[in-house]
Curated annotation (Swiss-Prot):
GO terms for molecular function: nuclease activity. Its main location: cytoplasm. Its EC number is 3.1.-.-. InterPro entries: RNaseH-like_sf, YqgF, YqgF/RNaseH-like_dom, YqgF/RNaseH-like_dom_sf. Keywords: Cytoplasm, Hydrolase, Nuclease, Ribosome biogenesis. GO terms for cellular component: cytosol. Belongs to the YqgF nuclease family. This is Putative pre-16S rRNA nuclease. It is found in: Cytoplasm. GO terms for biological process: rRNA 5'-end processing.
Length: 151
């Protein structure tokens, strides 16, 4: 894994990024456009094991001209790292070792809340919100990262 500052230096235009929201049961996936300006929810993967996740990511990467991976880091509100942050860090490290792309961790505080509230503003019904919350949270994470990278 690399730092966001190194990622900013190394990232190139005309490639897309994947954003990941690694949950205990589901993994939200988002992808940005090639101009790296808009993050879009892509899919939700039911969590099985890290190797199957990596295989699934390799397919997405191959099919979508992906140039980097941004993983939501569940930092506690006080800035400390809890048990879920350690788990995410372990998975992100395995992804980084298995896929030859830059991988960074991005602070995901309030991403799920933000995604849920945004879908509420868009008048999406509750059952659809629940089905898509993980990929929407991944888009929220990715959008924050690409906004930072572009400024």
């Amino acid at each position: 894994m690399i730092t966001i500052e190194d990622f900013k230096i190394k990232h190139t235009n005309k490639v897309r990024f994947i954003g990941l929201d690694l949950g205990s049961k589901r993994i939200g996936v988002s992808i940005c456009d090639e101009r790296q300006s808009i993050a879009t929810p892509f899919k939700t993967i039911n969590k099985t094991n890290t190797n199957e996740l990596i295989d699934e990511l390799k397919i997405i990467i191959k099919d979508n001209n992906i140039g980097g991976i941004i993983v939501g880091n569940p930092v506690n509100m006080d800035g400390s790292l809890g048990r879920s942050a350690q788990s995410v860090n372990d998975v992100a490290s395995n992804i980084s070792k298995s896929i030859d792309l830059p991988v960074i961790l991005w602070d995901e505080r309030l991403s799920t809340v933000g995604a849920f509230n945004l879908s509420s503003l868009l008048d999406v019904n509750v059952s659809k919100r629940v089905k898509t919350i993980d990929q929407n949270a991944a888009a929220f994470i990715l959008q924050g990262a690409i906004d930072f990278l572009n400024n």
